[in-house]
Regions:
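Positively charged, small/polar-rich N-terminal and surface patches that mediate targeting and assembly
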Residues: 1-106
Length: 106
């Protein structure tokens, strides 16, 4: 199993989630987060000294999926969230060693 983690622009969250739902993704978790990376960070921090309210808001999506679905999910997220401009976000994939449903554990 894999964990797909995506940080995307909040403006594209509805389109990404809709496309994942249409593709049969059965569940995901979404978080409102703040942060930044890349070349903008140096300029940004020189003007705004590390105050959380000054960081741009993004959406963090997490999808646990079968290994064979990973590439499809990554591509769906990338297509729906891509503008071609800096700040579109990132997608990371991690291995998931074990998944258990809490209600089904003894």
């Amino acid at each position: 199993m894999k964990l797909v983690i995506a940080y995307i622009r909040t403006d594209y969250a509805a389109a990404v989630i809709h496309d994942l739902y249409k593709a049969g993704v059965g569940g995901l978790t979404a978080y409102a987060v703040r942060g930044m990376s890349g070349k903008k960070a140096t300029f940004f921090y020189s003007k705004h000294p590390f105050e959380i309210d000054h960081l741009p808001e993004s959406l963090k999506l997490e999808v646990v999926c079968a290994e064979e679905s990973t590439d499809k999910i990554v591509e769906l997220i990338a297509q729906a969230a891509r503008t071609g401009a800096a700040g579109d976000g990132i997608i990371a994939v991690q291995d998931v060693e074990r998944v258990m449903k809490i209600r089904e554990t003894a």
